[in-house]
């Protein structure tokens, strides 16, 4: 069965009485080059254990099982369980987990299914869970890389440079844990039903060690969250949402870090955020 052929897909779904759910962000791939190129970009091979989230009917899954030592796919929509059992019936290195990926313990899944294998994430992620899923993946520190098809706008945010409109707290988070690269875009015509936006594939090798030294990651994310809380305001004003320090002291801390007093949060690089975090932590400790 060609899992990217529009007519075969429609026949398969009709046979199982399936209707697309907008609430679940379901858009199935109908161009074979897309799942093939995603699987290639992931670097999956016989020594790889792949976690896939949101397999749909399995076009990317089919590419991954051909390359990988083991594929574990997590699907929330119970209507797709019998569909996947049919489309993946011949794959002896495939396991379906029925449930919500956001409720899974990723390190435990890897221990149970990927012993001796290099764990990676490779998925055509539903748009509505992209940010929380990627956040959960990087914070779990258990994947070697993430290769995902997501909304192009989100991909550009993840790969953005400091000082651009796309740069934000999520950018800093992803670039702290990974080295993201936008590989290629995927037009709406490659999906059924066609979404209203263009998609993109990003590959994110996970860093072995943090790129900067901070007093604690909790304090770093506190600083980043505060810095972007009031995007139209200066960094000093924004920091007041997260730190109970006098404005004058915050200004002194910002300038001591080599930043202009009137700088805005989106101008700070990851290195700037690390220096600022450590200075703020020291100021609080001295109170």
Residue ranges and their predicted role:
Residues 1-226, 255, 266, 275-278, ...:
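Catalytic cores of RNA-modifying enzymes
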Residues 225-287:
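C-terminal lobe and adjacent flexible extensions of AdoMet/dcAdoMet transferase-like proteins
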